[in-house]
Amino acid sequence: MHRAGAAVTANVWCRAGGIRMAPRPVIPVATQQRLRRQADRQSLGSSGLPALNCTPIRHTIDVMATKPERKTERLAARLTPEQDALIRRAAEAEGTDLTNFTVTAALAHARDVLADRRLFVLTDAAWTEFLAALDRPVSHKPRLEKLFAARSIFDTEG
């Protein structure tokens, strides 16, 4: 779980414009749904079609400690003038400095890349621990058995 005093933020993927790089407060799902319904009611134009709105389709949760860690590592990159101008304009549009913008963007992309990995390399000790966890006997879980015995909303009639 989160440490006491830690702030929880979310980056939200949107259909209309990619990822929002600056950390934003997490909005509860019920509040998001209510706001979406209100926006849909208000955005129906003369065509009867709702206006394009940004719907959260994926959340990335970051936990930021209240006391920042000491940063000792450096990262440098060579850019073309066009790349530099584009990144600077994007950082300005987000209302953040260039360093924070690039680090946040790089970290978000790194998390996405590593989350999709299919192959994990383990040390011998980690592999032994993993095999031991697989070989442990199954414990009896009555609530789980009850859940699996119940009819699912995805079951078809027939």
UniProtKB/Swiss-Prot annotation:
<keyword id="KW-1277">Toxin-antitoxin system</keyword>
<dbReference type="InterPro" id="IPR010985">
    <property type="entry name" value="Ribbon_hlx_hlx"/>
</dbReference>
<keyword id="KW-0805">Transcription regulation</keyword>
<dbReference type="InterPro" id="IPR014795">
    <property type="entry name" value="TacA_1-like"/>
</dbReference>
<dbReference type="InterPro" id="IPR016547">
    <property type="entry name" value="TacA"/>
</dbReference>
<dbReference type="Pfam" id="PF08681">
    <property type="entry name" value="TacA1"/>
</dbReference>
<comment type="subunit">
    <text>Forms a complex with cognate toxin TacT.</text>
</comment>
<keyword id="KW-0678">Repressor</keyword>
<comment type="similarity">
    <text>Belongs to the TacA antitoxin family.</text>
</comment>
<keyword id="KW-0804">Transcription</keyword>
<keyword id="KW-0238">DNA-binding</keyword>
<dbReference type="GO" id="GO:0003677">
    <property type="term" value="F:DNA binding"/>
</dbReference>
<protein>
    <recommendedName>
        <fullName>Antitoxin TacA</fullName>
    </recommendedName>
</protein>
<comment type="function">
    <text>TacA-TacT both represses and derepresses expression of its own operon.</text>
</comment>
<dbReference type="GO" id="GO:0006355">
    <property type="term" value="P:regulation of DNA-templated transcription"/>
</dbReference>
<comment type="function">
    <text>Antitoxin component of a type II toxin-antitoxin (TA) system. Counteracts the toxic effect of cognate toxin TacT.</text>
</comment>
